[in-house]
């Protein structure tokens, strides 16, 4: 008789990571969740496999596969079954907030009749070939998730010296039309040196009234001590910033400024030269040297690129505010590039649905993603040292 070798789940998960590095994280997660689900079933039954005991409530009845969309891609878990009781492992029921928000967006599209091939394909992988969903089921699940996300969006804020503001657009169904809605995002660096996602909002545009309402909501939650705002040059945001935080200086994003300069330079070779000149200005050791280099560049541009010179005379000084802050902080404060990770992840996550069924669905997914990112930042390393 052959000897049966028991595989330790922790060893199997470790082996997956050892063999494939972070690429094996999905397999490690699958192994550990499967084991956690089996342990939870044993606790529910009041008995381990094959154990005879008077405390047993029911009997194990095999497993059913379930495919879940996670940040590691599609993972198929083995869901433990029981004979006659209502049991489901909590690890698989909950999932991550972002995964739930993505799946709810698809489910909302389905029950509202937006049954595109892509939506059907994904839901069939999640729920099986026979999709059985009702509006009531989807509404209950959405309400449960929204409660926690609303609490996160409305949590108290505090001392936040540096405030980053940005927006991106998502396609949303609104009053029978498909419109581009602005997703307003605020990220801050707290006095502790940690980055935090401060809030988000879905609006019909980046008009002043929307940015103003968003900024006022941050102040109402306790945001204070802001010494610098880092943002791109947008008329609505600029007007709202002046109205709500008039005394706080503004650092214009240097990265987007360089992109704008490139559009005002016709020849490719000249574009490279202008980019190098702008980098020299931005990388200057202090404001005095930066202003000297800018003055020299403007003299050249007036002759060779008059349109660029006219624009740069007012635009570039708006990107030099950072020189009034500690040298050790400047590299973190020059651009809004730190928000690009958020935008990349949002693009990846929204690709499945492509069009949100309503603004609430869009806000739910954005909030879930940002809440998870905020958790990472809160427990991670200090981003900026205020006490060198």
Swiss-Prot record:
It comes from the Bacteria. One of its GO terms (molecular function) is transposase activity. Pfam families: Transposase_mut. One of its GO terms (biological process) is DNA transposition. Keywords: DNA recombination, DNA-binding, Transposable element, Transposition. InterPro entries: Transposase_mutator. Belongs to the transposase mutator family. NCBIfam families: transpos_IS256. Required for the transposition of the insertion element. This is Transposase for insertion sequence element IS406.
């Amino acid at each position: 008789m052959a000897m049966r070798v028991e595989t330790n789940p922790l060893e199997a998960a470790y082996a997956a990571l050892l063999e494939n590095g972070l690429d094996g994280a999905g397999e490690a997660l699958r192994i550990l969740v499967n084991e956690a689900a089996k342990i939870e079933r044993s606790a529910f039954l009041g008995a381990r496999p094959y154990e005879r005991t008077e405390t047993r409530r029911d009997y194990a009845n095999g497993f059913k596969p379930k495919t879940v969309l996670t940040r590691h891609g599609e993972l198929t878990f083995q869901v433990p079954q029981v004979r006659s009781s209502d049991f489901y492992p909590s690890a698989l029921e909950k999932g991550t907030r972002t995964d739930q928000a993505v799946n709810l967006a698809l489910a909302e599209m389905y029950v509202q009749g937006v049954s595109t091939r892509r939506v059907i394909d994904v839901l069939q992988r999640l729920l099986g070939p026979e999709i059985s969903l009702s509006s009531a089921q989807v509404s209950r699940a959405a309400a449960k998730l929204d409660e926690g996300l609303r609490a996160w969006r409305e949590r108290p804020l505090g001392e936040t010296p540096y405030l980053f503001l940005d927006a991106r657009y998502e396609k949303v169904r609104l009053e029978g039309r498909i419109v581009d809605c602005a997703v307003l995002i605020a990220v801050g660096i707290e006095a502790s040196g940690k980055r935090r996602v401060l809030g988000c909002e879905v609006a019909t545009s980046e008009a002043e009234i929307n940015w103003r309402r968003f900024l006022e909501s941050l102040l109402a939650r306790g945001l204070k001590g802001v010494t610098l705002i880092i943002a791109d040059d947008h008329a609505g945001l600029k007007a709202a910033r002046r109205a709500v935080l008039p005394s706080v200086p503004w650092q214009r994003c240097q990265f987007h400024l360089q992109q704008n300069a490139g559009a005002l330079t016709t020849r490719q070779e000249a574009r490279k030269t202008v980019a190098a000149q702008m980098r020299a200005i931005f990388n200057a050791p202090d404001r005095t040297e930066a202003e000297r280099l800018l003055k020299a560049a403007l003299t050249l541009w007036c002759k060779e690129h008059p349109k660029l010179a006219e624009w740069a005379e007012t635009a570039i000084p708006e990107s030099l505010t950072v020189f009034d802050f500690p040298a050790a902080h400047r590299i973190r404060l020059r651009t809004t590039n730190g928000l690009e990770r958020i935008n990349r992840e949002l693009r990846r996550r929204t690709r499945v649905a492509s069009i949100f069924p309503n603004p609430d669905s869009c806000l739910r997914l954005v909030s879930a993603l940002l809440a998870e990112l905020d958790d990472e930042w809160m427990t991670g390393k200090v981003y900026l040292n205020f006490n060198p």
